[in-house]
Regions:
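Glycine-rich phosphate-binding loops of nucleotide-dependent enzymes
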Residues: 2-260
Length: 260
C-alpha cells in the first residue's frame, strides 16, 4: 500500500548553519512529488532527514501516521521506505543480480541476519526473491547482464540497477535522488517511461529530487520548491516554472527583472 508522508516545521542545523528552516508539506498516497530548487537549496539534506541519514534538529516527520524523525534507516526500511542516491552505491565486484538482491533482504524472515547465517527457513523466501529479482531485470531489459560484474556496465545502467534494487524491497515510499544525473537524453526518456510503468504497476508514493525540469514536468503531480533551506512554494511543475519567486531563486533577481 502506498504511504503518505507529512513534514511539519522540520529544521536542520549544523552548528550555527541553518540548513533547513520550518519546512512543512504533505504527500498523499500514490502521488509523485518533485522536490526542486537551485543548488544549495537543501533538497538532499531534506532527503537525508526523511531517510534517516540526518536527524532533524526539530519538527515532525511521519510516514502513514507513524512518527519517524530521527529513526534509523533500518527501521524506515521496515516501514516501507527505499531510496536511491545521486551516485549509485553498488558493490562493483558483485554481479548485477547480487546487487539487486540486496534490496530483498529486508523481506526475508528474520531480516538480513538470518540470510547471512543461512538459516533453513530463509531458503524458500530467498528463492522467491531471487526469482522476483530476475523477473525485474528481464522486465527492464537487463536480464542479459544478471551474471555480469556491475563494474562492466555503464553509469546509466548503474542507475537502473540501484532503482531495481530499491524496488525489490517492495517499498511504499520511494525516494529518488537526482535519478537523471549523468544520463543521456535517451536514457532520461527511458527513465521517464520506467517510472511511469512503475507507477502504473505498483501502489507506491514517489518523491524525486531532480534538476532536470523536463523529467519533473513529465512525471510529477506536484512539486515543492526549496530555496536557502525554506519552502518557497508548492504547486504543479507548470506553476513552479512560471512563478516569479522560483525564477528569481534560479537565475537571480536582476536577471529575472531583465527577463520580465
Amino acid at each position: 500500500m502506498a504511504a503518505s508522508l507529512s513534514l511539519k516545521d522540520v529544521n536542520l542545523h549544523f552548528g550555527g548553519v541553518k540548513v533547513l528552516q520550518d519546512v512543512s508539506f504533505d504527500v498523499e498516497p500514490g502521488v509523485i512529488l518533485g522536490l526542486v530548487g537551485p543548488n544549495g537549496a537543501g533538497k538532499t539534506s531534506l532527503f537525508n532527514c526523511i531517510s534517516g541519514h540526518y536527524k532533524p534538529s526539530s519538527g515532525s516527520i511521519t510516514i502513514t501516521g507513524k512518527e519517524v524523525r530521527g529513526s534509523a534507516p533500518s527501521r524506515l526500511a521496515r516501514l516501507g521506505l527505499a531510496r536511491t542516491f545521486q551516485h549509485p552505491a553498488l558493490q562493483l565486484n558483485a554481479t548485477v543480480l547480487q546487487n539487486v538482491l540486496l534490496g530483498g533482504h529486508i523481506r526475508l524472515p528474520g531480516g538480513p541476519v538470518s540470510w547471512a547465517l543461512r538459516l533453513p527457513y530463509t531458503g524458500r523466501a530467498e528463492r522467491a526473491i531471487r526469482a522476483e529479482a530476475l523477473e525485474l531485470l528481464d522486465h527492464a531489459g537487463l536480464g542479459w547482464a544478471a551474471e555480469l560484474p556491475a563494474d562492466e556496465l555503464s553509469h546509466g545502467l548503474h542507475k537502473g540497477i540501484e532503482l531495481w534494487r530499491a524496488l525489490l524491497s517492495k517499498p511504499a515510499l520511494l525516494l529518488l535522488d537526482e535519478p537523471a544525473a549523468g544520463l543521456s537524453h535517451g536514457e532520461v526518456q527511458q527513465l521517464i517511461a520506467t517510472v511511469k510503468r512503475i507507477r502504473a504497476e505498483q501502489d507506491i508514493t514517489i518523491i524525486i529530487v531532480e534538476h532536470h525540469m523536463g523529467l519533473i514536468s513529465a512525471l510529477t503531480d506536484q512539486v515543492v520548491v526549496l530555496d536557502h533551506g525554506r519552502k518557497l512554494m508548492a504547486g504543479t511543475a507548470a506553476e513552479a516554472q512560471s512563478d516569479p519567486r522560483v525564477i528569481e531563486a534560479y537565475i537571480g533577481k536582476d536577471s529575472a527583472d531583465d527577463a520580465a
